Amino acid sequence: MKKQFNRMRQLANQTVGRAEKTEVLSEDLLQVEKRLELVKQVSHSTHKKLTACLQGQQGAEADKRSKKLPLTTLAQCLMEGSAILGDDTLLGKMLKLCGETEDKLAQELIHFELQVERDVIEPLFLLAEVEIPNIQKQRKHLAKLVLDMDSSRTRWQQTSKSSGLSSSLQPAGAKADALREEMEEAANRVEICRDQLSADMYSFVAKEIDYANYFQTLIEVQAEYHRKSLTLLQAVLPQIKAQQEAWVEKPSFGKPLEEHLTISGREIAFPIEACVTMLLECGMQEEGLFRVAPSASKLKKLKAALDCCVVDVQEYSADPHAIAGALKSYLRELPEPLMTFELYDEWIQASNVQEQDKKLQALWNACEKLPKANHNNIRYLIKFLSKLSEYQDVNKMTPSNMAIVLGPNLLWPQAEGNITEMMTTVSLQIVGIIEPIIQHADWFFPGEIEFNITGNYGSPVHVNHNANYSSMPSPDMDPADRRQPEQARRPLSVATDNMMLEFYKKDGLRKIQSMGVRVMDTNWVARRGSSAGRKVSCAPPSMQPPAPPAELAAPLPSPLPEQPLDSPAAPALSPSGLGLQPGPERTSTTKSKELSPGSAQKGSPGSSQGTACAGTQPGAQPGAQPGASPSPSQPPADQSPHTLRKVSKKLAPIPPKVPFGQPGAMADQSAGQPSPVSLSPTPPSTPSPYGLSYPQGYSLASGQLSPAAAPPLASPSVFTSTLSKSRPTPKPRQRPTLPPPQPPTVNLSASSPQSTEAPMLDGMSPGESMSTDLVHFDIPSIHIELGSTLRLSPLEHMRRHSVTDKRDSEEESESTAL
C-alpha cells in the first residue's frame, strides 16, 4: 500500500506539479510502441471478419462441418430434385450433374476453411490477443518501475536536504542511505524491464514479415481452393453442354436462324412451317390476313407454344390472324433479317432499277447470293405468299398488300436510322423488292414445293371468320355431321342463328335481308357470279366479246372427274307445257352434287336465264361438242329478265330499261359495274341447300311453262341441287384429254347458246364473274327432272313426302334446342 501511495503521489507531482519525469525508452522504441497498438487493432478486426467468412462451424471436425455447410445442403436438395423429376428429363439430368458438382465443391470448401483456420486465423488471433498484449503488459510494468524509481529518488533527495539543516547528522544519514539503496534497487529493476521490453519490441519489428505472410497464405489457400473448384467446374461443364445440345426442344423466337436449324435438324424453321401449314388449311380465304391485328393474348400464347414446339391446331384454326401474327413476329424477332444484312445494299440497288427485266434479274442475282438456310426459308415463304395471292379476290391480299405488311419483317437496315426515313423511303424500297418476287415466284424459285414437310399442322376445319354466320346445313347431311360445322363456327349468338334458320326456311331471303342480316352463301354467290356469263351468252353473237386466249386454251378443270352427259343442252319446252320434244334421254340435275364447285357454277345459270335466248331461237339444235361445256344439262325453265328483276332485291341502281329484244345492251351496261357482293369474302363453308319457292302469282313469258301447269313437287331435297364444300380455284392448266373449245360462230343453227356460254365461263373465276355483275338474282334455281317426275309412282311420292317432313321436324327441333 505504501508503494502504491508513493506511485500515485509521484504521478500526481509529475502531472500537476513540476516533478521530473524519467524517460527510459528511446525514440525508436516509442514509435514501436505506437505501432503495436495499430497492429493489434488491425489484427483483431481481420480475425473477426475472417471468422465470419467461415461457412462451417469453427473448431469442429470435418464431418460435423460438412453437415452444416450450405453447399452440402444445396447438393442434397439438387439430388433429391433430380430423383423427383427423373433422369429422362433435361431438368432432372441437369439437377443430378449440378448436385454432384456442388457436393464436390463443398468438400473442397471444407478443406479450404480448415487450412485458412490453421494457417491464417489462429496466427492472427495469437498476434492480436497474445503477443502484442504481452508487450504492452511489459510496457505498463516498466512504467510502474519508473514511478517507483522516481519516487525513491525524490524521497532520497528530500532526505538529503533535510539532513544538511539538522543538528543530529547520524539519524539523518542512516535514513538517506536506506533511501539511496532503495533508489538504486528500483533503477536496477527498471533497467532489467526496459531491456526485456526493448528486446520484445525489436523482435516484433523483426517478425513483421511473418505477420505479413499470414495474408499471403490466405491468398494462396484461396487460390488453391478456387483452382480446384475451377477444375471441377470445367470437368462438368462439357457434360452439361452435351446434355443441353442433345435436347432438341429449344426456343426459336429471337434465336439465329442457323442455330435453330442446326439444333432441330430442319431445313425450314419450325415457326415458319407450322404457321404456313396451318394457314394453308384455315386462312387462305381470310380477309386481311397478315394485315388485321390479332388478339395480343392469343398471339403471346401461340408464340410460347411455338417455342415449345407444341401447337394446338384445333384451337388456332379458329383464329388465322393469330397464326399470321406469330409468323410476322418470328420474322421480325430474328437477330438478322431473313434476307440478311450483308445483301441489304444489293437488295436496295436492285429495287432502284427502273427497267422491269433488269430489275428482276438484279433481284434474282441477289436472291442467289443468300445463304442456303436463308434461301430455303425465303423460297418456302415466297411460294406460300404466291399461293395466298391466288385468293386475293377473297382475302384482299394482293402481292402489293403482302409486300407492304411483310416487307419490313423480311428486310431492314442494320443501323437504326431516322424513323421517318425508315417509314417512307426504306419502306417503299422494300415493298419494291418483295412485290415482284411474289408476283414472279415461279421464276425466282422454279419447281413445286411441299409445304407440310415434317408433320401435320393443318386443321381439318375450314372456317371463314369474317362471315358473321356459317352457312345453313344441308338437309341431305346426317344430323351428327351437321353439328360439326356448327360447333366450329364463331359463337356470336345462338338465338340469332336459330332465328335466321327459321326465317330462311319459312319466309325466304328477302325477309332475312330486310332484318339487316348479311347472309353469306356460296350457292347464291355462285349463281350471282355466273350471271354475267349468262347475259353474254344470251346476247346476239355479234355483240359477244371474244374470250381471252389463255382462257380459251386452258379451261378450268374440275377436281372430280366429270360425268358424261347424254345431251349437253336440253331442248326447250313446247307451249303446251308438258309435251316434250323428241331427243336423247335427259340426265337428272341431281348429278350436280357430285361435280366440282366450278362445274356447279357453270351448270346453274341456265336454270334462271340461260335458256331465255333458246326460247327465242326455235332453230337451235341440242347437238354440241361434248367437251365444250362440262356443265350438266340445262333445266327447261325459261324466265323473263323483266320478271326476275321484279323479284330480286335491288342492291345497286338498275340501269335504264331497254326493250326485251336487246338483252345484250343490258349485259354491256352491267359489265363495268362491280358487284356489291364481291366486296365481302365468300365463306368456304357448306352452301345452303334451301331453295326459295316461287310465288303462286308468278308471271312467265309467253310460250313458257307456268307453275300451275307443272306437276306438284314431291320434296325440295329431290329436285334441288346441293353444292359441295367450295374449294379454291386451281391454276389453269391444259387438259391433255380434252380439246380446246371452238370459238362461237355466227350460224345459230350449228350450235346452241349453251355451247357459246361454256368457253366463256370455263376461264372465268367466280371473282371475275362477280365483279361484272350489277343486277343480282338472289332466287335459287330449282332444277326439275320432268321425265323422272312423270315416272314417279304414288308410293314414291308418299315416301319422299315423309322423308322431307321428318327432316324438317329434325331441323326445327335442333334449332329450338340451340
Curated annotation (Swiss-Prot):
Residues 479-489, 794-809 have a biased composition (Basic and acidic residues). Keywords: Cell projection, Endosome, Exocytosis, GTPase activation, Phosphoprotein, Synapse. GO terms for molecular function: GTPase activator activity; phospholipid binding; small GTPase binding. Residues 563-579, 614-641, 688-708 have a biased composition (Low complexity). The modification Phosphoserine is found at residues 493, 809. A motif (PDZ-binding) lies at residues 815-818. Residues 255-445 form the Rho-GAP domain. It is found in: Cell projection, Dendritic spine; Recycling endosome; Presynapse; Cell projection, Dendrite. Residues 598-611, 746-757 have a biased composition (Polar residues). Highly expressed in brain. Expressed at weak level in other tissues. GO terms for biological process: exocytosis; modification of postsynaptic structure; modulation of chemical synaptic transmission; negative regulation of filopodium assembly; negative regulation of Rac protein signal transduction; regulation of actin cytoskeleton organization; regulation of dendritic spine morphogenesis; regulation of GTPase activity. One of its GO terms (cellular component) is dendrite. It holds the Pfam family RhoGAP. SMART domains: BAR, RhoGAP. SUPFAM superfamilies: BAR/IMD domain-like, GTPase activation domain, GAP. The record marks 291 as: Arginine finger. Residues 467-493, 530-772, 789-818 are annotated as: Disordered. The keyword rRNA-binding does not apply. Residues 14-249 form the BAR domain. Residues 731-818 are annotated as: Interaction with BST2. GTPase-activating protein (GAP) that stimulates the GTPase activity of Rho-type GTPases. Thereby, controls Rho-type GTPases cycling between their active GTP-bound and inactive GDP-bound states. Acts as a GAP at least for CDC42 and RAC1. In neurons, is involved in dendritic spine formation and synaptic plasticity in a specific RAC1-GAP activity. Limits the initiation of exploratory dendritic filopodia. Recruited to actin-patches that seed filopodia, binds specifically to plasma membrane sections that are deformed inward by acto-myosin mediated contractile forces. This is Rho GTPase-activating protein 44. It comes from Homo sapiens. The gene is ARHGAP44.
